């Protein structure tokens, strides 16, 4: 029998053991964790919609009409009108022909990749892509070729070496733990040069990047350039779910081939209703997106000025690099004791030796909130010798 206890002991000895914190209130700039009021500085609730009254009303009205569950998969009895409406709206929002909604972003990635590719494919994958992308490739049986993070020279050399008739380049649009934006324009150029398909995971870009919040394609001014565009409803949208958007024939194919779609109970109607309301807000209230960008730049620049190892960037994900696992955990705990919630991110989520605090900004954070966080980050950063 497998030695679970021994494996857990090894995890603890490496400083990698995780314990759950219990959230006792809605997520906003402040929440309640284990009974304590905390400044939330690590949520993916970028536009502050998780607790928006309009989304809650939409969900409640849907529950009154449709109940709390879908009752079956989309291909049996669980296909509600709200699913169709959201898919049509998302396709229009992403400026593509069609869209398919999954229960989560993870399900969208593994379903799309394993549904499209098989052992005859070669898939080129950025080294820092999300785990769901890597799992989807492994599930498909395709040959996995990893290229250096955002390194187009390395990608091209590997395309020349490994490219076959059926090949795909897949990348995060915004990398979830680093906050940097993939050079999607250059990836598309390489794909056209060598006749490959492209897939972009825009989980952390949808609703955030681009003039209308459509994601990395809009950010780079690309039209009909990315073959497969994935997004989530659980970040800027503040709800739950994932989707894949693209050509009508692609989406129709995935309805018949994506196992995580076929064999899962459909997302509950109230999630779709809340997501539709979130989309209304994203399309009609660009000010929140503008404020998010301004606040993200403000805090990032202040941290750099104070001497922290923080890369430049344009997204609300701000990685404060620490390196050592135990130091990152201690830093996080010192902040927690002061009422600031920023968990330490450790391997295997990030590569060994790159443990960090993943700070993320919400449009609903005030500058006073960020000043309070900054003051304590500097205070404890100096105490731990992270900054002079």
Curated annotation (Swiss-Prot):
The keyword Transferase applies. It comes from the Bacteria. Keywords: Biotin biosynthesis, Pyridoxal phosphate, Transferase. GO terms for biological process: biotin biosynthetic process. Pyridoxal 5'-phosphate binds at residues 105-106, 176, 201-204, 232-235. PANTHER family: CLASS II AMINOTRANSFERASE/8-AMINO-7-OXONONANOATE SYNTHASE, LD36009P. Belongs to the class-II pyridoxal-phosphate-dependent aminotransferase family. BioF subfamily. This is Putative 8-amino-7-oxononanoate synthase. It comes from Acetivibrio thermocellus (strain ATCC 27405 / DSM 1237 / JCM 9322 / NBRC 103400 / NCIMB 10682 / NRRL B-4536 / VPI 7372). The gene is bioF.
